[in-house]
Amino acid sequence: GALEELDDAIKAIGAHATIVEHDMGDFAALPRLAAAINQRWGRLDGLVANAATLGTLTPLSHLDPNVWDETISINLTAQWHLIKSMEPLLIAAPAGRAILVSSGAAHGSYPFWGPYAVSKAGLEAMGRVWAGETEQTNLRVNIINPGGTATNMRAIAFPGEDPNTLPSPDAIAPAFLQLLSDDCQEHGRLFQARNMLGL
């Protein structure tokens, strides 16, 4: 899988990584993960909150309540648990950086995208609140909209779209690296990855 490929790439340059599989619906595991990070490294230099589920594309009035609950749970509630668990480790770092990954759906009011759009709008609001709360620390929190990207989720949402017309995740990654760098002093802002990279 992709994580194993990343691990191989890291090893190829002489570094090492610890791969941890985690179900974002398992909220209780996040404090344990934070404790393990603290025990091994004592800090967290960067966090990218990218986990998401699309849910079902259907009118709000037809939506299965379980789909609503799951989408909000993974896309918003789990991210709050992540913030709660990881904030002390990020603040312990000399230049902790956090990125919350949003979507154009947070602003587009796309019909049939109800729980996904609502969860991403909520994520952006939470990111701004978190940035305000950490203003006086070394932590920098920002939000990024990658834009349409050739991912599995995009293929599910737009099955007729040619993925070759979209940037790959690798093409978008430099925008994330900018916001994760020690030099980044932006805080509490929403960035459009394509604009950052001139795509």
Where are each of the predicted segments found?
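The beta1-alpha1 cofactor-binding region of Rossmann-like NAD(H)/NADP(H)-dependent oxidoreductases
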Residues: 20-32, 65
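Substrate-binding pocket helix/loop in short-chain dehydrogenase/reductase
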Residues: 58-60, 64-69
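Conserved catalytic-site loops of classical short-chain dehydrogenases/reductases
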Residues: 45-46, 69, 96-101, 139-142
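Catalytic loop of short-chain dehydrogenase/reductase
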Residues: 53, 91, 97-122, 127-136, ...
